[in-house]
């Protein structure tokens, strides 16, 4: 396990711990307290991850793993800048026109993950191209995503879990 994978797993663990601790607190913290938390912890607490969350965390992962320039300030980018960056890397489809606040569906996350990992599953996808549906099936088959409905919106903690598995898969490659 590399240092990067360990770091991402630690971030995920901290996020999940924060969710657990927050569930024990009777008075939810105010927006001011939440704004001081790391983005990964704030996202882990969300019942539904957004497209903006996914784009931000995938860009951070790509920067951490050297897929994009380490000097790139992904935290300072707006949604359209993140979209352009991920589109340039081939992680998102050019036809996507999502609202940043839209819920992140499992099949969309699977497409991003399969593209990030450069997964080329089979004959049909080599002919017709990668789709969100087949990406989701392939990510499930590889154990990178859990079973569920493809159009179901993922939680923040599920988003972090999938990204951690992606990081581990990427780091285990020669």
What are these regions (language model features)?
Residues 2-5, 23-70, 96-174:
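Terminal recognition/anchoring or ligand-binding modules at protein termini
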Residues 9-20:
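Bacterial N-terminal signal peptides
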Residues 14-16, 92, 165-169:
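N-terminal processing/targeting junctions
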Residues 72-91, 99-106:
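Acidic helix-start/capping segments at beta-turn-to-alpha-helix junctions
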């Amino acid at each position: 396990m590399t240092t990067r994978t360990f770091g991402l797993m630690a971030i995920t663990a901290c996020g999940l711990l924060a969710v657990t601790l927050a569930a024990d607190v009777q008075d939810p913290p105010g927006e001011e307290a939440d704004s001081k938390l790391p983005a990964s912890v704030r996202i882990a607490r969300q019942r539904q991850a957004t497209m903006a969350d996914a784009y931000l965390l995938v860009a951070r992962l790509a920067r951490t793993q050297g897929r994009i320039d380490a000097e790139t300030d992904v935290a300072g980018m707006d949604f359209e800048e993140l979209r352009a960056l991920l589109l340039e890397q081939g992680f998102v489809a050019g036809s996507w026109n999502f609202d940043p606040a839209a819920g992140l569906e499992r099949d969309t996350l699977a497409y991003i993950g399969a593209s990030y990992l450069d997964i080329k599953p089979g004959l049909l996808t080599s002919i017709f191209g990668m789709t969100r549906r087949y990406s989701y099936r392939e990510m499930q088959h590889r154990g990178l995503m859990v079973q569920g409905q493809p159009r179901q919106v993922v939680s923040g903690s599920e988003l972090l879990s999938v990204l951690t598995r992606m990081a581990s898969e990427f780091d285990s490659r020669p």
